[in-house]
Every structure is written in C-alpha cells, then in structure tokens.
Amino acid sequence: FGPILPMMRFDDIDEVIARANNTDYGLAGAVWSADIERAVQIAGRLETGTVWINENLQSTPLTPLAGHKQSGFGAENGIYGLREFTQPKAIYIPKSSDAVA
C-alpha cells in the first residue's frame, strides 16, 4: 500500500482526467493550480473519494472518507461514517388505545 504520484506532461486537460481515472483505484487525489475555479472543475471530474486542491492530507472528523472503485467500500467519518455503524428500525404504534388488547 502506498501513494502513486505520476508526473507526466500533457497538452490537454481531458487527457489528464482520462488518464487519472483510468485506474481500478480511487481513494484520493490532488489538483495543484493557480486557477482555483479550474481546479474545482477538474476535481469534480476525478473519480476519487477525496480531492485536495493545492494541499494534501487535510481532513476532519466531520468529513467523510470513502474510496471509489477498488479503494474500499463504505465510509468513515461524518454522517456517512455514522450510518455505516447503524441499523435503522421502524416501530409503529397505533394511534388509538382500542388497538391494545
């Protein structure tokens, strides 16, 4: 287990995104750019559970951590993580007391 850091030169952003997404894994990625709006657009197209922009490894207990593809299943942290450890149950109670025998 370890990070993968491919460093290649590209002329077309669509090719970059296609290459980045052409993997069985999708835990996390990072986009580095002086143009934050463009970086956000690129981040939205990456098939990963987490994308950092101009930084890496920032996280909080409120932020869900979930991998895409073969990078795991389920989620940790945040409301999504809490749901992984719960099992919903519905209990119905009649409105009238006549229903109780």
Region spans (language model):
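Conserved C-terminal structural/oligomerization subdomain of aldehyde/semialdehyde dehydrogenase
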Residues: 1-101
